[in-house]
Curated annotation (Swiss-Prot):
Amino acid composition bias (Polar residues), ranges on this chain: 401-411
Compositional bias segments (type: Gly residues): 323-335
Top-rank lineage group of the source organism: Eukaryota
Family: Belongs to the FAM43 family.
Location of the region described as Disordered in the Swiss-Prot/TrEMBL record: 263-298, 321-344, 382-423
Cited Pfam families: PID_2 (PF14719)
Protein name: Protein FAM43A
Acidic residues bias locations: 263-283
Comp. bias (Low complexity): 383-393
């Protein structure tokens, strides 16, 4: 064997594997020292304290329940001239009841009461594709569980038409038992009161924030954080104006600089051509008259126009003003003189009219709140329908047809004067 190949095939023994040493990190020693010092400092209850350090903290979260839903039979609606007050729905409900043939004709629907308002969708599966109806909460002026027809729940809604026109309509639904109608009325009243209080609170907070921004600076006071808006959600009591159908559509305004320049030049030329003390100008000034009288005439015309638009809302005001004056005022008509409403100052008349219109936003309740809250049969139905509770809706049921014949005949006489629009 050659000398340089002598150790070529020597085999070396494999070294034994090293045992993994226990980690002696800083964190382990720190935890051990902290636990030992805690146990020495607090010998009583040390184990429970140590366990609470490593125990996960449990949090209780309130999950919002679904909005209460009821199965109803929608009977229809009828126009009314009273937005609130005891008995304001008697005539309209009588018309609806006679039109629906004592509750035998109607549309079966699912009615949901929420912070947005009253939502109704068709209950039949074949009619699910048909659009539902949403009655916004801030436009509902009155609700009641009718005492003459115990199974009928009615509400007055302020419909907004084109050109800011307003129409009051009474809607009525038939339910399976009187307690359900009372529960629906109580639930709508409570929901409206809570939503209105929340709307006022948010409005006051926004107003205070805007005032601080005006005083201190816009960049100093931040707006409401996005997380709070996502957590609580916007207030549904009164939606923004852009969602209203009567709101005007705003578009872009294009400026015509050339046209403005030409108009300004023509105006300057006319001023230069017409000298001071021109007799034509004096005649125009004499024809213009006193500006104070013009302003008074404009205010009278404005109040008369508002009176024609909101005539049904001003009946009580006119009657009270007529009694105070001894019945000396004339009737309001095309050829008549100014109404009794115009005898006061323009500011007082505007204030009274605005107060009447602003009061429409608050829901008026036609039943006794304390009596309904104390009735357990009513309060247990506030969460919605129970199983089999809609079994006797169709056909009116025995309680629904037990209305007095005198009321039905009396209301049927007035039904021909004003035909209701069924929904």
């Amino acid at each position: 064997m050659l000398p340089w190949k002598k150790h070529k095939f020597e085999l070396l023994a494999e070294a034994p594997p090293r045992q993994a040493s226990k980690p002696k990190g800083y964190a382990v020693s720190l935890h051990y020292s902290a636990l030992s010092s805690l146990a020495r400092a607090c010998p009583e209850g040390a184990l429970s304290r140590v366990g609470s350090m490593f125990r996960s903290k449990r949090k209780k979260l309130h999950i919002t329940s679904e909005d209460p839903t009821y199965t109803v039979l929608y009977l229809g609606n009828a126009t009314t001239i009273q937005a609130r007050g005891d008995g304001c729905t008697d005539l309209a409900v009588g018309k609806i009841w006679s039109k629906s043939e004592a509750g035998r004709q109607g549309t079966k629907m699912k009615l949901t009461v929420s912070a947005q308002g009253i939502r109704m969708v068709h209950a039949e599966e074949r009619a699910l594709r048909r659009p539902g109806h949403l009655y916004l909460l801030h436009r509902v002026t009155y609700c009641v569980a009718d005492a003459r027809l115990p199974k009928v729940f009615a509400w007055v809604y302020r419909h907004e038409l084109k050109h800011k026109a307003v129409m009051l309509r009474c809607h009525a639904v038939l339910v399976s038992k009187p307690e359900k109608a009372q529960a629906m009325a109580l639930l709508l009243y409570q929901t409206s009161a809570n939503a209105l209080a929340e709307f006022k609170r948010l409005k006051r907070r926004d107003d205070a924030r805007h005032q601080q921004q005006e005083l201190v600076g816009a960049h100093t006071i931040p707006l409401v954080p996005l997380r709070k808006l996502l957590l609580h959600g916007p207030c549904c009591y009164k939606p923004p104006v852009e969602r209203s159908r009567s709101a005007p559509k705003l578009g872009s305004i294009t400026e015509d600089l050339l046209g403005e320049q030409l108009e300004q030049e023509l105006q300057e030329e006319e001023e230069e051509e017409q000298p001071e003390g021109c007799p034509e100008e004096e005649e125009n000034r004499a024809a213009e008259g006193d500006p104070a009288e013009e302003e008074a005439e404009a205010q009278r015309a404005l109040v008369v126009a508002m009176h024609f638009e909101c005539g049904d809302l001003l009946d009580t005001l006119e009657n009270g003003r007529g009694e105070a004056l001894g019945g000396g005022g004339g009737s309001l008509g095309p050829g008549a003189g100014p109404p009794p409403l115009l005898l006061g100052s323009a500011s007082d008349m505007k204030a009274e009219l605005s107060q009447l219109i602003s009061d429409l936003g608050e829901l008026s309740f036609g039943n006794d709140v304390r009596t309904l809250q104390a009735d357990l049969r009513v309060t247990r139905l506030l969460s919605g329908d129970s199983t089999g509770s809609e079994s006797s809706i169709e056909g009116g049921g025995p309680d629904a047809t037990s209305a007095t014949a005198g009321d039905s005949s009396r209301q049927a006489d007035g039904a021909s004067a004003d035909e209701p629009h069924s929904g």
